[in-house]
A protein has these predicted regions:
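Short catalytic/binding micro-motifs of nucleotide second-messenger systems
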Residues: 231-235
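Extended hydrophobic secondary-structure segments that form protein cores and membrane-embedded regions
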Residues: 243-248
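Extended alpha-helical interface modules used as scaffolds for assembling large macromolecular complexes
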Residues: 12-224, 228-230, 241, 254-266
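A short helix-loop-helix "switch/interaction" segment in the helical subdomain of ASCE P-loop NTPases
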Residues: 1-12
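Short, internal active-site loops enriched in acidic
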Residues: 6, 249-254
């Protein structure tokens, strides 16, 4: 479904609808015109939040608890500010409700990704060409994909690394790739659950599936983990080409230092 859900009632953003009417029924992304909460960016930085987790998010009753400004919960903030909505409600083994959350629609996905990207690069004009990454995945051109990602990290201002403690965490680099791909409108699954573990990032396209694992400073071999745990088995019945991609980041160079890939062969 598309839009918001509050315990059974579906709705769209009313202010978005008013803007749509006032602009003579012109279809466009109106999310930024409803406000850009910069405090979300600061909360992400402060808590080292792994953004791909937003696609498989489950919370308990704290979601509906009162808003405590002295104890900000990132998931609750996203829910109350409209960046997350209830997908469905389940009952835990203890009998209490559990809420599965989702990002409401593509407009919100792109808006959330864009505010993070703009903050990261500081200048929208230096953001690497999105077309290169988009085309590389559509054309299954892994060399171009690698080069585009490398260029993307190279374009991040140095101060954003030196003044950011998150740069020492694997989640920092994975989150950048996640928001960048999401801003392009791809179907992204973060922390994709399989019977053998969790895939860091899965990109599902019409003609192919990309299974991506991230590592930091060569501590482990990313591609080897994908093959060892047979993450690809989850998608064998989709009759699509499957690409296994292992990416390692170097915290000194602040970029990718190893990019290995294989096309899965039946």
């Amino acid at each position: 479904s598309n839009g918001y859900n509050f315990l059974g009632s579906d709705m769209y953003n009313p202010f978005d609808i008013l803007l749509f009417i006032s602009k003579k029924h012109k279809y466009q992304n109106y999310w930024f015109e409803t406000g850009t909460p910069t405090f979300l960016i600061e909360l992400i930085k402060k808590n080292n939040y792994f953004l791909p987790a937003l696609t498989n998010l489950k919370v308990d009753e704290k979601l509906l608890s009162s808003f405590d400004i002295n104890n900000l919960d990132f998931e609750v903030i996203l829910y109350q500010s409209g960046y997350l909505t209830i997908d469905k409600v389940e009952t835990s083994i203890f009998g209490s409700p559990e809420y599965l959350l989702k990002i409401p629609n593509k407009e919100v996905k792109r808006s959330l990704s864009d505010i993070i990207i703009v903050d990261l690069y500081k200048d929208k004009n230096v953001i690497p060409n999105k077309t290169a990454i988009y085309k590389s995945l559509l054309e299954n051109d892994m060399d171009k994909f690698k080069g585009s990602l490398h260029s993307m990290f190279s374009s991040i201002p140095y101060n954003n690394y030196t003044k950011n403690d998150l740069a020492i965490f694997e989640g920092f680099y994975a989150s950048i790739i996640y928001v960048y791909l999401q801003s392009l409108g791809f179907h992204i699954i973060g922390e994709d659950v399989t019977n053998k573990g969790r895939i860091d990032l899965t990109i599902v396209m019409d003609n192919a599936i990309y299974i991506i694992e991230f590592k930091l400073d060569g501590k482990e071999y990313a591609l080897e983990q994908i093959k060892k745990k047979k993450y690809y088995e989850k998608y064998l019945n989709q009759n699509k080409d499957i690409y296994l991609v292992g990416i390692n980041f170097d915290t000194n160079d602040k970029n990718i230092n190893s990019f290995e890939w294989e096309k899965y062969q039946l």
